[in-house]
């Protein structure tokens, strides 16, 4: 059939005690045992995500992207360990490392996202994992993931990557040396802003550990959410291509605007890590930031408030365009943010880009009025 059905059920029944015991023995394969272990609806989505990542052994699903990041780290860390995180990390990743992992006796340090192979100079005797995010979702530095992974592998350190921006469609992470790849499926996988979900994919070495950690922590997604995510997955490629084309058109237009300083889009030559993006990525998604010249918080707010086709919201990757004021300096500890003007992050959705540029032009009129 075209669409796998939504298989709802908390309890799986067995024909007799012999089948019950056989099910218990084969529990490790993640198949029928109890509803928390999933059903064909969840399994079909997980299998599809695994097939999209060359070299993968399996995928676990989680009720949010933060749950996916947290469980992936918990699967490879123990008290006394240290984890390195990019200084451009998603803020909830920092919070989990600085607060929750600290309570468990696990320390965290942050590194310059442009450090590349020199990250090896930061490895200590207790460094057991490194969490990358490339590009960062505020300032969009593209990391040299293959170089970092080679350094990590040589030191016996697990390399994890938040790959939400590119997905495996534009950046097959395991092929570039990553051990464990994470996506907030809420974003581009689902694509319709109606489901929260995370996914973690890995190869044979870490698959059993990842799966058991998720099961022991009771991580499960509903079959209805899995069905909707699978629906989104079917149109992922065509949506990403439209996000890419529209975002790049708008980013180039913004570079010509007198109100704009930096445009932080990895496909633009002056974006940090652009050469790495050209080498490693198959495309760019619809999320990027730009800096307003000579502005302040008040004029930035006037610009955003004047937009009618851009919603104001924290998420991204959906069909709708969003605008958000962001302040990356607040989230840096190992490096300093070099920008001089207020930053705006745009999620370019699936609307007509000409309409979006007209809306942004109207916003710039209000921006200029707020400065006068």
What is each stretch, according to the model?
Residues 1-29, 369-372:
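N-terminal glycine-rich, Lys/His-bearing helix-loop that initiates the first secondary-structure elements
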Residues 15-16, 20, 29-30, 37-38, ...:
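Active-site C-terminal subdomain of aminotransferase-like
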Residues 16-67, 92-99:
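Conserved N-terminal alpha-helix of the aminotransferase class I/II PLP-enzyme fold
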Residues 57-257, 264:
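Conserved PLP-enzyme active-site core in the AAT-like
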Residues 98, 107-109, 128, 294, ...:
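PLP-dependent enzyme catalytic core of the Aspartate aminotransferase-like
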Residues 100-102, 216, 305-309, 361-365:
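Short, solvent-exposed amphipathic alpha-helical segments in soluble enzyme
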């Amino acid at each position: 059939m075209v669409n796998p059905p939504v298989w709802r059920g908390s309890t799986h029944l067995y024909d007799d005690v012999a089948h019950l015991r056989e099910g218990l023995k084969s529990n490790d394969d993640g198949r029928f045992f109890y509803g928390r272990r999933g059903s064909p609806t969840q399994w079909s989505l997980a299998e599809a995500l695994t097939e999209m990542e060359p070299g993968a052994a399996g995928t676990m699903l989680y009720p949010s992207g933060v749950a996916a990041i947290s469980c992936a780290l918990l699967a490879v860390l123990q008290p006394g360990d240290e984890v390195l995180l990019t200084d451009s990390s998603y803020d909830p990743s920092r919070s989990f490392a600085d607060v929750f992992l600290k309570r468990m006796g696990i320390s965290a340090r942050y590194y310059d996202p442009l450090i590349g192979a020199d990250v090896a100079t930061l490895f200590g005797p207790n460094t057991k994992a490194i969490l990358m995010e490339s590009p960062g979702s505020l300032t969009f530095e593209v990391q040299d993931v293959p170089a970092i992974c080679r350094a990590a592998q040589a030191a016996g350190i697990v390399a994890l990557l938040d790959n939400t921006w590119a997905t495996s469609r534009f950046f097959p992470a395991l092929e570039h040396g990553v051990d464990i790849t994470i996506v907030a499926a809420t974003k581009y996988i689902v694509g319709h802003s109606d489901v929260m979900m995370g996914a973690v994919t890995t190869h044979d070495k870490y698959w059993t550990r990842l799966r058991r950690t998720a099961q022991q922590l009771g991580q499960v997604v509903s079959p209805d959410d899995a069905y909707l995510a699978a629906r989104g997955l079917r149109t992922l490629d065509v949506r990403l291509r439209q996000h890419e084309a529209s975002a790049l058109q708008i980013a180039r237009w913004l570079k010509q605007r007198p109100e704009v300083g930096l445009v932080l889009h990895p496909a633009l030559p002056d974006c940090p890590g652009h050469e790495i993006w050209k080498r490693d990525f198959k495309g760019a998604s619809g999320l990027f930031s730009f800096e307003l010249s000579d502005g302040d918080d008040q004029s930035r707010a006037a610009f955003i408030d004047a937009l009618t086709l851009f919603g104001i919201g924290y998420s991204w990757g959906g069909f709708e365009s969003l605008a958000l004021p962001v302040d990356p300096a607040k989230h840096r500890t190992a490096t300093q943010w070099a920008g001089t003007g207020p930053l705006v992050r745009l999620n370019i959705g699936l609307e007509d880009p000409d309409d979006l540029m007209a809306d942004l032009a109207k916003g710039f009129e209000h921006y200029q009025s707020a400065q006068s």
